[in-house]
Amino acid sequence: MRNQIILFGWITLLLFPIPGFCLQYYFNDISFIEFISLQDFEIIPIAYGIQFGVFYAFIAYLFMKAPYFDKIPVKVNKLVHNMKLTVADGLFLSLCAGVGEELLFRQGIQSFTGVIFTSILFVALHGYLNPFNLRFSVYGLIVLPFILLISYGLDSFGIWFCIAAHFAYDAVLFTFMIKEGKQSESNNKELI
C-alpha cells in the first residue's frame, strides 16, 4: 500500500497541475513559467505560508483530538497508520499535495470559479464535506477556513505562499499521525 500512496504523490505533483495550466494557457495565454510564478518564489511569502500552515495544523489537530471525533467510523490517523509511511514519506506527500493541488486549484481553477466556490470544491473533493457522514463533515468545516484564507492570500502573497501553507499544514498533521501510529504500535507490542 505504501508504494501505491507514493505513486499517488507523484501523480499529484506531476499531473494535477496540467489541467490548471491548460485552462490558463487556453483562456489567458499564460506560459508555463508564468503559471508556476517563479518570479514570486521569495522567502518572505514562503515563510508566512509555512508559519500559517503550521499554526493552523496545530489548531486542526487539537480539534481532531476532541471526543466528538471518536465516533467517526474510519479516522484519518488510522488510515495513515495503515499505510506504513515514514515521516520522510509524509513530508514527500505533503510537498506533492502542496505543489500539485495548489497549482491546480489556486493557480488554475480559482480565477474562473472564484475563491469561495473553489475552496468548497477543494474541501468536498477531499471527502471532508460528506452529507452521509456529518461528523466527518465537521472536520471539513474546520479545514474550510484554512483553505479560504490561503485562497484569499493568493492575490497578496502569491502561489508560493499557498503552496508553503498547504505543505506545512499537511506535513505537521502527517508527522503527528505517523508518530502517534508508531507510538500506539509500540504500546500494543509491550502489552503482548
Predicted regions, residues:
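Serine/threonine-rich low-complexity intrinsically disordered regions
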Residues: 1, 31, 39-42, 135-137, ...
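N-terminal membrane topogenic signal
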Residues: 1-13
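Transmembrane helix-loop-helix hairpins at the membrane interface
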Residues: 81-192
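Helical transmembrane-bundle signal
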Residues: 16-20, 170
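Juxtamembrane helix-loop-helix connectors linking adjacent transmembrane helices
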Residues: 22-97, 183, 190-192
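Alpha-helix initiation/capping motif
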Residues: 5-6, 37-42, 114, 133
